[in-house]
A protein has these predicted regions:
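Hydrophobic, aromatic-rich transmembrane alpha-helices
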Residues: 112-120, 275-316, 325-327
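Specific aromatic-rich, kink-prone transmembrane helix
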Residues: 117-121, 155-174, 180-188
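Loop-to-helix entry region of an early transmembrane alpha helix in multi-pass inner-membrane enzymes
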Residues: 78-114, 288-293
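Short acidic/glycine- and proline-prone juxtamembrane loop motifs at membrane-interface regions
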Residues: 145-156
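Transmembrane alpha-helix segments characteristic
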Residues: 18-20, 132-137, 183-188, 297, ...
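Extracytosolic helix-loop segments that constitute the early lumenal/periplasmic catalytic or substrate-binding loops
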Residues: 31-36, 47-77, 86
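Perimembrane helix-loop-helix junctions
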Residues: 166-173, 179, 200-227
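Membrane-lumen/periplasm interface segments of specific transmembrane helices
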Residues: 214-300
C-alpha cells in the first residue's frame, strides 16, 4: 500500500496487515477453514509431522532428538530430515516467539509477510499492483495454500520475493545501498544453505555487480561457499528416508577426475526426469498439470520478453526470471 500522508513505517504496517487479511480470507473462502480450526499434528502429510516436530525440537533442545521414520526406525540425535539443518534454524528465529502445535504455520505467515514487505519496498508497488500480485498468486493456489501448513515451501517463496525486492531496490538506486547489498548476500546465502539449487538466486547480485571485478568476484565466492556449505551440512546432519534428495554421483565423479562419467551421469538423470515429466503430463496427473501451468507461465514470460525487446522496453527482470526458472 502507498500513501503520501503516511510515513514509510506506517505504510509497511498497513501493507503487512492487508497481506495478512488477504491470506486469511483466501484460506477461509477457498477451503472453508479458519485459522483456529487448523491442527497440524493431525495432518495426513507425513512431511508436516516431521517438520513440525523438528522445529519444536530445535527451539527446545537445539537439535532434533530423533524422529520416527519409516518402518518404525529412528534418526540419530542431531540428524535432520529432508534438506538438512539450515531450514529449521531459520524457522527457529520466529519459532522462539510463536510456540504451540501450530508454530510452523505462524512461522510461515511471518516469513511470507516479511518477503512480501521486502518485495513491495524494493519494487515500489502501489496498492493496485499489489492487488494484481495477490490475484496472481491466488490463481496459482499453492503459494497461498502451503502457508497454512507445516511445509517449507512458503520460506522459499519468501526468500525469492525478498531477493527480488532487494535486487530491485539496488537497481533503482535505493538509499543505504551498502546495507541492502549485505542483506541481499545474506538472503542468497541463506536460500542456498536451505536448498542447493537455490544457488541460482546468486544470479541477481551477479548481474547487478557486473562488470565490477571485485563485486563479481565476491558474488562468485559467496555462491560457491554457500553451495559447498549446504552440501557439507546435508552430508553431516541429514537423515535420509526412502530416497536421497540430492544425488552427488556426478560431483563425486568430478572430484575423482572422471569428467566424461560425470557428464554422462548428468545426462541420464536429465533424460530420466524428462521422460518422467512426459509420462506425468500424458497421464493427466496433478503433477503433470502443475508442469503444464509452469510451461504456460514460461511461454507468457518469453512472449513478454520478445514483445518488450521488440519495442525497446526493459527486459532485465523478465530475462533473470526465465533463467532462474529454467535452471531450477
Amino acid at each position: 500500500m502507498k500513501s503520501k500522508t503516511l510515513p514509510a513505517w506506517a505504510r509497511l504496517v498497513c501493507t503487512a496487515a492487508a497481506a495478512l487479511v488477504f491470506l486469511l480470507v483466501y484460506e477461509w473462502a477457498v477451503y472453508g477453514v479458519s485459522l483456529g480450526k487448523i491442527y497440524l499434528p493431525a495432518s495426513a502429510w507425513s512431511d508436516e509431522v516431521y517438520y513440525a516436530k523438528q522445529l519444536s525440537a530445535v527451539v527446545t533442545h537445539g537439535v532434533p532428538q530423533g524422529y520416527f521414520g519409516f518402518n518404525e526406525s529412528h534418526a540419530e540425535i542431531g540428524r535432520f530430515a529432508a534438506w538438512g539443518p539450515a531450514v529449521f534454524y531459520l524457522y527457529a528465529i520466529p519459532g522462539l516467539i510463536f510456540r504451540g502445535q501450530n508454530a510452523f504455520l505462524y512461522c510461515n505467515l511471518f516469513w511470507v509477510l516479511a518477503g512480501w514487505l521486502c518485495f513491495v519496498w524494493g519494487t515500489r508497488l502501489d496498492w493496485k499492483r499489489q492487488l494484481l500480485f495477490g490475484v496472481g498468486i491466488a490463481a496459482l493456489n499453492a503459494p497461498v495454500r502451503y502457508v497454512f501448513s507445516a511445509m517449507q515451501e512458503p520460506l522459499h517463496y519468501a526468500l525469492v520475493l525478498a531477493v527480488l525486492g532487494l535486487a530491485a531496490g539496488i537497481r533503482r538506486g535505493c538509499r543505504h545501498a551498502g546495507a541492502v547489498w549485505a542483506a541481499l548476500f545474506a538472503l542468497c546465502a541463506a536460500a542456498t544453505l536451505v536448498r542447493p539449487y537455490n544457488a541460482v538466486l546468486w544470479l541477481f547480485p551477479l548481474v547487478l555487480a557486473w562488470p565490477r571485478r571485485k563485486a563479481v568476484g565476491g558474488t562468485v565466492v559467496g555462491a560457491a561457499a554457500s553451495a559447498a556449505g549446504t552440501l557439507v551440512l546435508m552430508k553431516k546432519f541429514y537423515a535420509p528416508y526412502l530416497f536421497a534428495n540430492i544425488d552427488l554421483g556426478a560431483v563425486e565423479e568430478l572430484l575423482h577426475g572422471h569428467f566424461w562419467a560425470a557428464a554422462r551421469s548428468v545426462y541420464y538423470k536429465l533424460l530420466g526426469a524428462w521422460q518422467q515429466l512426459g509420462q506425468e503430463i500424458a497421464d493427466g496427473t496433478r503433477v503433470g498439470s502443475c508442469y503444464l501451468l509452469l510451461f504456460a507461465l514460461l511461454l507468457v514470460t518469453l512472449a513478454c520478453v520478445i514483445w518488450n525487446a521488440a519495442h525497446k522496453q526493459p527486459v532485465f527482470w523478465k530475462v533473470c526470471a526465465l533463467v532462474v526458472t529454467l535452471v531450477v
